[in-house]
Structures are given as structure tokens and as C-alpha cells.
């Protein structure tokens, strides 16, 4: 399974568990931050064709919309949680540079800014625009894209 960083394309910041813990508590919010360290590495665990779990490598927890709803409303925070279920499935779109929840919405920086400050929370939202694009890059080279479905 490929290990990667999730990089906000517009700002160059990376998805992190808030506080940077190697074993964050359930429901720890996911934020954007400029730091790079081993506590913000992810892997993609394919479950059903293009759908899978985005796993935080250090803790084994996975990315969820807060509350684990199948169709979360706009502005629902993105968190890490230990539970695995179909309401925590995502597709990683290399061609359009987005991360889509199985409910049809996308991961965004809260507020939709193209250059959010450090510790900006991430949310689920239905809009599509350049400020919600993410790319998947190597921990060894933050400018080198990697295939997460490998």
C-alpha cells in the first residue's frame, strides 16, 4: 500500500490531525498545515473498486465526516475515527484533483479559501472549485505525485 501526503493544491498545505498526534483521539478534526512529519502520512485501503478508506498511518484511524452520516450536510467537519463502515468511504480522484465522499460531496478547507491559514479545519461540501482540489504526493518529495490506488 502506497504511503502519501494529502496536499491542498492551491496553498501547498497538508492534511493533518489537529495537534499532530501520532495517536489522535476519535473525532480529532483534520486541518490544513504547512508542516511535514510522519504523523501526517496516509494510505488508501481500497474496499470496492474506486471506494476505500483513507487511513492515518500512525494511528490506523480513518477519515470520516463527523457523526459518520451517509449524506452529511455541507460544512460537516472531517475527523479521524477508528470505525470502518460504508459512510467512511471516499474516492481519490487523480484527474480532477479532489476527494469525494461516497455521499457525493467533497473535502474542502472550511470557508473555501485558496490560501487558508495553518490549522484551518476541513469540511465536506458539495461545491466544486479550484480551492477544493487536493493532490497526493510522496512523503520523500512533496512535489512528486503518487498513485494511491497502487
Swiss-Prot record:
Per UniProt, its applied use is: This protein may have potential in cancer diagnosis and treatment. A synthetic analog of this protein with enhanced carbohydrate-binding properties may be designed for the purpose of constructing a biosensor for cancer diagnostics or anticancer therapy. May potentially be used as an immune modulator in mammals, because of its effects on macrophages and its ability to promote secretion of cytokines.
Q: Name one GO molecular function term.
A: carbohydrate binding
Q: Where do the record's glycosylation annotations fall on this chain? A: 26, 74, 118
Listed A to Z, the keywords are:
Glycoprotein, Hemagglutinin, Lectin
The superkingdom listed in its UniProt entry is: Eukaryota
> What is said about its interaction partners and assembly?
Monomer in solution. Homodimer in solution. Exists as a monomer in solution when a low concentration (0.001 mg/ml) of it is present. Homodimers start to appear at a concentration of 0.01 mg/ml and tetramers at a concentration of 0.1 mg/ml.
The beginning of the lineage is: Eukaryota, Metazoa, Spiralia, Lophotrochozoa, Mollusca
Q: State the organism of origin.
A: Crenomytilus grayanus (Gray mussel)
Q: Carries keyword Nucleotide-binding?
A: no
The protein in question is named Galactose-binding lectin
